Amino acid sequence: MTRFRIALHIVPRRGILDPQGKAVSDALHSLGFPGVQDVRVGRFLTIDTTAENAEAARQSARVMCEKLLANPVTEDFEIASVEVS
């Protein structure tokens, strides 16, 4: 088994109210950043795990997100990277 570090991004789906993102967007505008169009506030996770290969680690991360880490109704997730650690 090989040890992998997986990086995940979980964010609210488009069209889902993101009050935290709205607050950050408003604050950025008040600080002089008028070009900010949209802010989505989510979570960044790193998971250290073991697997036979990178594809098995990626598949495991996908199942983790589908079963626990991301709410499939309100959130989208992205497996940003799977690297040998």
Please place each PLM-identified region on the residue numbering.
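Long, contiguous binding/interaction regions
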Residues: 1-85
